[in-house]
């Protein structure tokens, strides 16, 4: 094969690889959607679409030139508009390839901050990552900047993309706070329990992992310069995630008694992230070790975030991308071997560098650690500033009601991403209020006395007493009021209740929404139906407590229905009447 033909073939493969990396956006969307709740699916899909589209706009305007423009002091590329002024001679292939890499960095953050982030805020910080944070540090590594000059090696982005995205995800999730119900606290505010909030569709999540794995062959292999090097990259890109998944399966099987499906899916991605930096310079043994460590590291990372840092990461983005991005970056300094095809790691003087375990000493390891520290520091400082500014201006987090109802209807006017298949995901988990939830003041407490008098008094003069002395009270209210209602009933002494999550609307037919510009008919809204049976506790007190708890003064506060109960029989003991309720009320 002549050099010219080889150049053409690999030029075409380079663009095919870019297309595969773009296809990874679909994989990220599926993983995030599957690992979160159905009521936020549309929001997840919209964010994964818009981070690429917004990223394209800002990458055209500034990001690409900062990354690959003429080097300025090893720190930054010279800003320019060659795509507009010199299109005929523009490096189109490099632009597309680096654009899809840039979009990957931004989309990693989405998963860790899912289900409680304002959409407008996501658009802003996603744009900043694509315009400034990623291009500048990527210039250090790939654009002729200072890290590339000293011999730092990150072939496809364990550091430049995954670690940066993972660090941004950690900082964002920490500032944002956990989802409602993720952590249970005692009266002193101390976290006593970590609650699982399962995703709604593991099938979609698994599909996303397979899409990402396929795309990773382009992610890691697109820049290969020979068939031999491409083949070696494909081998390491296959071995590492496979070993990571097997190790994770064994670990979770031993620890929990059964192999954990979602953790194994995360482990596959962790192995891919870890091998990305050194996929071109490691051999099969190195890939086995790198992948095996990644499989354990992702398990540790998920536990560490939940039980030590108390940071809520719904999809495991921090454990997968940050921790294994760091590991993959360091692993180059341990496992790089010059037996790999096309090996080209050298210091600023042109001296070849190899990994510690292959006789190269600590020099390459030191360079890799240096790169990790500086890129991590750059990312932490810049993204923290971005998130704090957004929090102080636009606000990062949606309201309590928006979070509980779901971001699909509240942020996008989409009643459900699964219209025609399911009414809505209104999770059955009890959602405890935490310090990151803005509850505001009680609407009843702040209402005028006239409104209180009109809304709350219970008139029972015309209601005949129940022959059995037992009443059934059915309360239908907004889902967002359930936690307060449950606590109010408990304080009153009513501990036995049946709770059903339902969809419905009153005469007002819910809030009108539009789909593709057309008006939707009556919108069914998520409601909660609470049924309690009371005997010794006066029914008037139950009604009054419920009304005070549910009152806002607006349409949709709910309804209370009271029924006579002829008889109650406890199946276990055969007790009847009031006695059958003694361990319920």
Annotate each predicted stretch with a short phrase.
Residues 1-461:
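Glycine- and aromatic-enriched membrane alpha-helices
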Residues 410-417, 429-585:
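Positively charged, small/polar-rich N-terminal and surface patches that mediate targeting and assembly
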